């Protein structure tokens, strides 16, 4: 759509490409898409299928973009979706823990240190410790969204493109907050992946701790 808006491709080509991509998307959703594992990755599979559907006009999807900015854009979109889903799940988990804690303010149990009885403790107070852990996890994931919300599309292989593209338009269409600032940094940046992995690791340790303590209590 941006290429058409900028008069880089015509109306006919734009419609053919959009129709083809929607067809591919439906095939993937319905699990009817036939992946060719001899091709490099999902992008090449989609491109190959698009050529089958609309012919040589599929070649225009290469216009004003590179594999470099395409892969990073897809990765950020996936991580944004996953991060927002995790935040919702953390909110739901904390809500359920709070409800359970409210019912057990006066439930007294042994508190453990080094797997031995240490001090008496309210079950509610113990449960609220997990609420604090998951609140920190949520904050980490929300902080990650700041960098995931920068649109890489349009930086090309390294130094942009000679086509008169509109990165602000693709930013709005893809629901990013703003375009990235520097093309060289953009194509080499994977910090946001490490941020997501770190947040996920810490969160998984908290979940593992709950599971371990439930096993001990039983």
Predicted regions, residues:
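A helix-coil-helix interface module used to build multimeric assemblies
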Residues: 1-160, 165-171, 178
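Generic detector of short, locally flexible boundary/turn motifs and exposed helical patches
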Residues: 99-100, 174-176, 189-190, 210
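Glycine-rich anion/phosphate-binding loop at the beta-strand->alpha-helix junction
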Residues: 137, 187-218
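A structural signal for small-residue-enriched, beta-sheet-centric alpha/beta enzyme cores
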Residues: 180-185
